[in-house]
């Protein structure tokens, strides 16, 4: 299986047995990126507070999704697929409606952006290493149902057959 340790960034390990494992990849995007971007954009650098806001947000207000391009009669199965994180903010600013942008929506958009980035890497490494199960763990996921839900959905977005598990421990 693949073990994805998400903290400030992401470290991806391929686990062949309890005694045999190797680091196969990672990325610099993780909780540190979420906190830094959140501080810069909405002035909040507390992880728990960011997640509280994200729980109340609707990213479709500021992300461009497939729904924005669908005609009335088109298939809506994937209408919420994100095409561009924060993609609608530019129009809010052009229309003079910058103060209508909600911190909650930005928090959720940023969380989705980080989670989709993380899962794209982990699913690609799982495929490259012929593995069908990913275990996510670390401070980013610990006892966090919203993060775990997004990671699960995003992993399935990249590969519907991937098995996703969560461990509530950190190393």
Which functions belong to the PLM regions below?
Residues 13-17, 21, 144-153:
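Short Gly/Thr/Asp-enriched flexible loops that form oxyanion-binding sites at enzyme active sites
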Residues 75-133, 140:
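Adenine-nucleotide phosphate-binding core of ATP-dependent small-molecule kinases
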Residues 151-171:
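Conserved phosphate-binding/catalytic loops in two-lobed NTP-binding clefts
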Residues 3, 9-15:
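Short beta-strand scaffold segments in enzyme catalytic cores
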Residues 6-9, 131-144, 167-168:
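Glycine-rich beta-strand-to-loop/alpha-helix junction loops that act as flexible
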Residues 1-5, 26:
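Short glycine-aspartate micro-motif
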Residues 18-71:
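Glycine-rich phosphate-binding loop plus the immediately following alpha-helix
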């Amino acid at each position: 299986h693949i073990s994805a340790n998400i903290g400030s960034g992401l470290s991806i390990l391929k686990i062949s047995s309890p005694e045999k494992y190797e680091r196969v990849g990672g990325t610099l995007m993780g909780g540190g990126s979420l906190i830094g971007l959140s501080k810069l954009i909405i002035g909040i650098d507390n992880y728990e507070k960011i997640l509280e806001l994200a729980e109340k947000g609707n990213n479709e207000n500021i992300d461009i999704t497939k729904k924005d391009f669908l005609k009335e009669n088109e298939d809506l199965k994937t209408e919420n697929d994100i095409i561009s994180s924060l993609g609608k903010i530019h129009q809010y600013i052009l229309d003079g409606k910058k103060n209508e942008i909600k911190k909650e929506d930005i928090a959720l958009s940023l969380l989705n952006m980080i989670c989709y980035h993380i899962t794209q890497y982990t699913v690609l490494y799982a495929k490259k290493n012929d593995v069908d199960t990913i275990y996510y763990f670390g401070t980013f996921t610990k006892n966090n149902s919203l993060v775990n839900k997004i990671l699960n959905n995003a992993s399935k977005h990249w590969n519907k057959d991937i098995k996703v598990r969560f461990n509530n421990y950190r190393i």
